Amino acid sequence: EVSEKRKSYIKAVAYYTKAKNWDRIAALYAGKNGRRLIERAPGIFQSVRENIEEVMWEKYPTVMLNYLYYMSTKENVHNVMPLYEEIINDINNHPIWKDNKFLMGEMMIILSILQFNNLEKMNQSLIKVREYFGERTSVIFGNSLLTYGTTCMTTLYYNKSGRLKEIIEQEKEYAKAYMRITQGSRVGWDEFFDAEYAMITGDIDTAYRLAKQVLLQNILRNQTCIIISCYYMILKCLIYYGKKEEFYEGIEKLNELTRDITYPLLIIDAELVQGYVYACLGQQEKMSDWLQNFRLENCSKQIRNIRSGCMTYGKLMCYKKDWAMLDMIGQQMMVPYENTSHIYPFITGCVYRAIAQYNMGNTTEAERYIKWAVELSYDDNVIMPFIENGVELEPVIENVYTDGFLESLKPYIAKYKAGIESFNAVKDDNPYKLTKREKELMEYVKAGYKNSEISEQMHIALVTVEKNLTSVYRKLGVNNRTSAIMMLQK
């Protein structure tokens, strides 16, 4: 009980297990911290699951909802569906819970998660949730789950050429339905998806205007997922415009907004946003370590959006001119994920492979992939993958293959190249200068001093050292000492 009061829930479960207090263990796993408890120590849950089974079905059925939610975000849908069907069957045959509409509504939310490859089915499931819930809202699921698919939500749901507008409209319905059952704000979602459509189809001015509008609408609403996604579009637009100072101001504001986030899904999403735009600029040292080193396990498990991680690493390989690795990344992006196709990453994969094959001297293959990319893009006018890779793609268009679609992209590519060049015009592209004290502090950091030693050398409190280090990291757009030192050396 002491451990529980101290919020040391894993210890509490261990002690309750020794005491064979299965009722209290079930209550912990059913409570508001149950899902996080399972996420932190799934093995412990499995070790007590059989013992709490009886009391769970008597009093705490939400234990299985929390476990099912955990499994739905960690495992392949085909591995989770048998468990889902088993639990649904248990509920339907249980004398207490079979007529509990609220419990069935929560199960339908989980079903919508498992249907993430089919937006139409997801919307149908959420309609049933409303029928079960009435005016009530989910007590289990937070609105940050909507971040599935962002940084570019359409990356996940756009699964057939010629259906982009239709998918955008379905996304609007899904977002509003999900917000309704999770007490989230419904403000701005229509405009957000309109901005995403504009971005994908190259209407940069409209994308920028709408993304800023939605950001302002939600900045005070604690609607973190839509804020992060708006910054993704805004920062990409600022690169296109070549607005360096506004870009770094945007990065700093995003850092301020997300600094205290603890939810893994949102942390990964924010790191994806910054990672991609930094990769576009070739600023590897500012990217999170897992993106720099192509370790995408968490990206895949947390938001089922491994393609965004691949696109980011591909951009980095373009900058580093590692054509063999770029070709491998492009190939991976073209492999169906969870038995479905994702058109936007597939197009980008074709573009990556066209660039890679051209630079490795295989013009026949380069032509095949660029034609494939155009074929998939033409009906919906998907042009952003070509624009953002225009610097490397330009010689392919000039020397291997072109057509009316590609010719129409040349003004966009020229504008994007100019934007990139404005960022690289001055070697020191960090507009935030360190103070005299911060410079002195960083000299000690580079020399290998510990924080306590720096405190003694500079005659300042340890907490002041830590505060100044945090300020330096923020100004440089990095997260640790090693990256800060690399930035200063550069």
Short names for language-model regions:
Residues 1-62, 83:
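Extended alpha-helical scaffolding segments used for macromolecular assembly and cargo binding
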Residues 11-12, 32, 67, 111, ...:
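Structural register within alpha-helical repeat arrays
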Residues 22-23, 60, 96-106, 136-153, ...:
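Alpha-solenoid helical repeat architecture
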Residues 31-41, 71-82, 112-127, 153-169, ...:
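Short coil/turn connectors between adjacent alpha-helices in alpha-solenoid helical repeat scaffolds
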Residues 33, 49-53, 85-96, 127-140, ...:
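Amphipathic alpha-helical segments of tetratricopeptide repeats
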Residues 56-229:
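Internal alpha-solenoid helical repeat scaffolds
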Residues 350-419:
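General nucleic-acid-binding
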Residues 421-470, 474-479, 483-490:
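Helix-turn-helix DNA-binding segment
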